[in-house]
Amino acid sequence: LDYWHMVEVRDYENLEDFFAKNQVEEMWCVSTKAPRSYTEAAFHDGCYLFFGKETKGLPEDFLRAHYDACVRIPMRPDARSLNLSNAVAVTVYEALRQLSFPNLRDFGKMRE
């Protein structure tokens, strides 16, 4: 796509590798097993968002260790979860909304 030049991709072996290489002051874990909605989180600039695999989610020991930082996207009782890309989009846009959409155009213009 034509916007890859705006993306910085970093690859980590696992969660331990990530934490060894980054200083994490604020984080949120998005999981179907979380106690509260993502809309209850107060997202700040520089926070990290963690999402697990579509098939398994984040490891339960990781969720237990960071339970106060776990949030969920409300779902119908008969549906398991959103797919990963949709869950990321929903959560990231809520975080950006709370930060007043920094560096994003927040207006539109009709063609004349």
Please place each PLM-identified region on the residue numbering.
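Post-transcriptional modification and biogenesis factors for structured RNAs
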Residues: 1-112
